[in-house]
Swiss-Prot record:
Pfam families: Ribosomal_L29
PANTHER family: 60S RIBOSOMAL PROTEIN L35/50S RIBOSOMAL PROTEIN L29, LARGE RIBOSOMAL SUBUNIT PROTEIN UL29C
Annotated GO MF terms: structural constituent of ribosome
GO CC annotation terms, alphabetical: cytosolic large ribosomal subunit
Top-level taxonomy: Bacteria, Bacillati, Cyanobacteriota, Cyanophyceae, Synechococcales
Protein name: Large ribosomal subunit protein uL29
Sequence similarity: Belongs to the universal ribosomal protein uL29 family.
One GO BP annotation of this record: translation
Annotated InterPro entries: Ribosomal_protein_uL29, Ribosomal_uL29, Ribosomal_uL29_CS, Ribosomal_uL29_sf
Amino acid sequence: MALPKIEDVRNLSDADLAEKIAEAKRELFDLRFQRATRQLEKPHLFKHTKHRLAQLLTVERERQ
């Protein structure tokens, strides 16, 4: 899974952006749960998800 380009994130509508933020937060929660129970098979996904969430939140903040 490649990290998303910031240009792709900036082209999202406000509704899509909010949906993607909620999705990334849910995925991060699931990854934390898997890590705590030692079921996480791909630890790099944790970093990718945090990075994607940071991009989404940055773009949301830029629009305010």
